Amino acid sequence: MGPTTNNLHAEVMSPGDFDLLSGFISSRCGIKLPPAKKTMLEGRLRKRLRSLGLDNFAAYCDYLFSQGGLEDEGVHMVDMVTTNKTDFFREPQHFHFLTQKALPELTQKLGWGSREKRLKVWSAGCATGEEPYTLAMFLREFGGASADFHFSILATDISTRALEKARLAIYEHEAIEPVPLPWRKKYLLRSKDKDKNLIRIAPELRSLVHFRTLNFMDDNYRIREPQEIIFCRNVLIYFNRPTQLAVLKRLCRHLRPGGYLFIGHSETLHGLDLPLGQCAPTIYRKT
């Protein structure tokens, strides 16, 4: 018999169980959870305890670290602890720089965006898809009606649950409020069910974004072609400084010289030895 809701709410994670679970989270996806986050972790994992019919967190640890447990439960664990908060048109200064500076430089001066030199953009840590779809809108608008502007968008995240929503591309109507009205008419579809206040990204835009799973902790990201633009925003804040440096070095390996890296406005590369020059706040170019 599964545990009752009352039992689960009364159950408290022991310091030892927290150490085991936070250590696993750190090694699996780089996220550091200080002891102050124990209550948060308890809250997020209670749903998994209910689903598995487990009475307490000690039993969950036994299951997670059992033979086959890591493979079966590891994905769910990551989904529970990763934060997928994002928005359309988040940090709009980045998109202004993208269209006014970065794209003209890359296309007009360096020739990217032609059929032979397709412009490659990577949304690293894309969560539920708002960022890559925003990028697709700006890139489509930058190219205008021209059929000669060629680009691709790679969007990656560690959370399979977030990627499922991103591929589905269905959002609450409130989420698209930052999108300009003319763009809504071009790129968004209203639900046919008037009782559902939902929108979906139009097929034309969905076809421009390729989603796949990627763990920043992996040594090899399996990205064959160098990218001209990388957006990795509000990801580094979850890592400690050594992990940030390791991840940024891997990102730089996949960024073409002269390409642009965009990070979140609460993040900094100050003091890190990287082949990047700052060209605006939180915007860098590979040297």
Could you say what each language-model-derived stretch is?
Residues 124, 145-231, 235-243, 268-270:
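Extended basic-aromatic, gly/pro-enriched interface segments that bind polyanionic ligands
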Residues 116-129, 154:
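Conserved class I S-adenosyl-L-methionine
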Residues 128-146:
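Conserved SAM-binding loop of SAM-dependent methyltransferases across substrates and taxa
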Residues 2-120, 264:
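Conserved AdoMet
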Residues 245-257:
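A short glycine-rich, Lys/Arg-flanked "PGG" loop and its adjoining helix->strand segment in the class I
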Residues 229, 270-287:
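Core SAM-dependent methyltransferase catalytic element
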Residues 258-265:
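Conserved beta-strand signature within the Rossmann-like core of class I S-adenosyl-L-methionine
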